[in-house]
Amino acid sequence: MNSRNIDWKRAAIKHARRTGAHVTTPFETAMPLRGELLSKYAQFYATFWGNGHVPRRTLELCRRRIAAIHDCAAEWSIEDAAAALSAAEADQVRHGRFSTFTEVERAALAVAEKIPFLHHDIDDGDVERIRSGLGEAGTVTLMTALAFFDATARLRIIMNAPVHPAILTDTPLRDGELY
């Protein structure tokens, strides 16, 4: 897809949001036979970003790390603008270098590292480090979000989802689209 097509798609999405029309995103296109499942999935996914228990930046760091572990370009190409990740920070996340992040972010990223292929290696110490920074509700939210980030990356790979770069300026799924 060339840059002209991407610009056209972004303009179409903005127009649809202004007029109230629905825009089908690549992820939605891949799941046309189970609309009710997609709707429930999207509603649940949106709760992580909007409940305030985990900072959006922490969620975005973890989502991008899981995408990098899976080498899922379709998931990696979506950015949450509110997370304010610099190019250097995104590169650190891609390559598993976390020393410059906060203690809570490092704890979350350590667990995110294990979710895709080593989830049985998550121990009480890992969870306690998250709990000490995010509290009980934040820990539950983060652990659930990590599982959904993993599932989303896997679904994108299985469905051969196209790379559709997007910079989200609002909470993911605020308008119902799952990029």
Regions found by a protein language model. Give the residues of each.
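Alpha-helical scaffolds flanking conserved acidic
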Residues: 55-61, 137-142
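Short acidic alpha-helix initiation/capping motifs at coil-to-helix transition points
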Residues: 18, 35-41, 71-73, 107, ...
